[in-house]
Regions:
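PRPP-associated nucleotide enzymes
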Residues: 1-191
């Protein structure tokens, strides 16, 4: 058995798996895939899940608008009070939910940065149910890293990355971090 007093923590090793141009290409492809799957932008609503899903939804909406020549409704969906770990962390400050009009009979695309366990998306489904009855709900993520705990799959994926449980996949966005990148950091401990 290891002695925590004498064990030194494993150093963190980080590597970039996608740079700014690769992130841009992935988002452009995702925008086209969303348009193809929906047969255009009609009735499409993109809802970003904070934090990084919000700027991703804005970017996808701008890319779709560039192709279609008309604006796409987009907003943000806070899931704070729908998370299944509230008992572990009961003090939470709900964020902002901004829905661009009714979502009834719309095709709602939930947008997030990384799909991992599926729990964030499960909470988003619960939050969405309280807001209306969309015709369909789709999921678009920049990164799918596997290791699901819930039976959830993304409809549109920018990049699939195989990562071990002791690795953290992080998305950096210019709006929040000053640059666009996808990194993997080995933490030395299982999540």
């Amino acid at each position: 058995m290891a002695d925590p007093a004498t064990d030194t923590p494993s150093p963190q090793f980080s590597r970039v798996v996608a740079d700014e141009s690769e992130v841009a290409r992935a988002l452009t492809r995702m925008a086209h895939e969303l348009l193809e799957a929906n047969h255009g932008a009609e009735n499409l609503v993109l809802l970003g899940i904070p934090t990084r899903g919000v700027p991703l939804a804005r970017r996808l909406a701008a890319l779709i608008e560039k192709v279609e020549g008309r604006p796409v409704r987009q907003g943000e969906l806070d899931i704070t009070m729908y998370r299944d770990d509230l008992r572990a962390n009961p003090t939470r400050n709900p964020g902002r939910t901004a829905i661009p009009g009714s979502i009834d009979d719309s095709v709602v695309v939930l947008v997030d940065d990384v799909l991992y366990s599926g729990r964030t998306i499960g909470a988003a489904f619960d939050a969405l149910r309280d807001l209306g009855r969309p015709r369909a709900v789709r999921l678009a993520v920049l990164v799918d890293r596997g290791h699901r705990e819930l039976p959830i799959a993304a409809d549109t994926v920018g990049r699939t990355i195989q990562a071990a449980d002791d690795e953290r996949v992080a998305v950096q966005l210019a709006e929040l971090d000053g640059t666009d990148a996808i990194t993997i950091t080995r933490t030395g401990k299982e999540s």
